Design a protein with these regions (language model features):
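C-type cytochrome heme c attachment motif
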Residues: 152-156, 211-217, 261-271
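Generic secondary-structure signature for well-ordered alpha-helical cores
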Residues: 16, 159-162, 211-214, 267, ...
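Iron-sulfur-associated redox domains of electron-transfer enzymes in respiratory
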Residues: 1-200
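Helix N-cap / loop-to-helix initiation motif
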Residues: 77-80, 215, 277-278
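Active-site-adjacent beta-strand anchor residues
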Residues: 74-77, 209, 271
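Ferredoxin-type iron-sulfur electron-transfer modules in oxidoreductases and energy-metabolism complexes
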Residues: 178-207, 221-323
Length: 323
């Protein structure tokens, strides 16, 4: 029985206990899938699970928990369960209200990498077959090696078949082919440069930010969208100018608000229309948090995030003597 059939079978067993279930469905577009909201058995057949399911459906958890009176089911990849764990650690919804259906993952494909490889050609169909991705454009057909086009997070994933939290787990017979690489390799390359070059690099990135708020809206941990500083008029924090200063202000505020909370799902970078490498910022924040507080977001929902706790003495932070 295929992974999709087993998923449908499991959902069929529990759907009566749920008011709504969020899963993946065909989008009608190559390389992409859509979220689907299922309320009865008639729509279960629309569920899919494949290498194009890159979206983190945990982004719907908080809003649905507020809006829906009954129980909620969410189909998640093992890495996505970290976002749920983090939300629970901040006591943002009742654990008993959420049914987590974790599906073992064999890696998901980054469609931006594929589009870059094909130099922007219009893709009209795509299909993952064994270790190959068959892509058809208007003029040509291509066979690409799947292992070369995984999302960056897949290369250092160590929980793809071992979700840290779930109610139902559907094991995937296909395993992730690549060995976890060096998680911080891109940061090390950037940080090997001098401070002036690093500053110049980020200025060049931030000036492209058009503040479409896609990064904020897709993030499962950015739950204060209706109270975001970008929408406040009194006080007025953010102007509508498009330049490196305003882009820097918005993105660094995001980093601060997500410090010790980001589970590094990469959704912010995935949806950015300007391809700003936002994951680098978030990984750096996570790296510092782990070093100072020995804490990794999304690992244990019983452990409070460092910025929601207070200690008289932090063993990894030395106080500066004031002269």
């Amino acid at each position: 029985m295929s992974i999709e059939d087993r998923l449908k079978e499991k959902v069929g067993e529990i759907i009566e206990d749920l008011e709504v279930l969020v899963g993946y469905s065909h989008s009608g577009l190559p390389l992409k899938v859509n979220p689907v909201f299922i309320k009865d058995k008639n729509k279960i057949d629309s569920l899919i699970f494949n290498k194009f399911c890159i979206n983190n459906l945990a982004t719907y958890a908080y809003s649905l928990a507020k809006e829906v009176k009954g129980n909620i089911g969410i189909v998640l990849k093992p890495c996505d369960t970290r976002s749920i764990i983090q939300l629970l650690s901040e006591e943002l919804f009742d654990r008993n209200k959420i049914k987590l259906i974790a599906v073992g993952c064999s890696g998901v494909l980054d469609y931006k990498k594929i589009q870059k490889q094909l130099e922007g050609q219009k893709i009209i169909s795509s299909e993952a077959i064994s270790n190959d991705l068959k892509v058809k454009t208007i003029d040509n057909e291509y066979s690409l090696k799947i292992k070369d086009f995984y999302a960056d997070k897949c290369y250092w994933c160590n929980i793809y078949d071992n979700p840290p939290l779930y109610d139902e787990f559907i094991e995937n017979e296909q395993k992730l082919e690549v060995e976890p690489g060096k998680k911080y390799a891109d940061l090390q390359s950037l940080e090997s440069q001098d401070l002036e070059e690093i500053s110049k690099y980020w200025d060049g990135q931030f000036e492209h930010c058009i503040r479409c708020y896609a990064c904020r809206n897709v993030c499962p941990l950015e739950i204060c969208k209706e109270k975001c500083i970008t929408h406040l008029e009194i006080p007025h924090w953010q102007s509508q100018r498009i330049d490196s200063n305003e882009g820097r202000f918005f993105q660094l505020i995001r980093v601060l608000h997500l410090a010790g909370r980001c589970t590094e799902c990469g959704e912010c970078e995935r949806v950015c229309p300007k391809n700003i490498p936002l994951s680098k910022l978030m990984k750096k924040s996570a790296q510092i948090t782990e070093r100072l507080f020995e804490y990794r977001a999304g690992e244990d929902f019983k452990k409070r995030p460092p910025f929601l706790t207070f200690k008289d003495i932090e063993k990894n932070i030395k106080e500066e003597k004031l002269v």
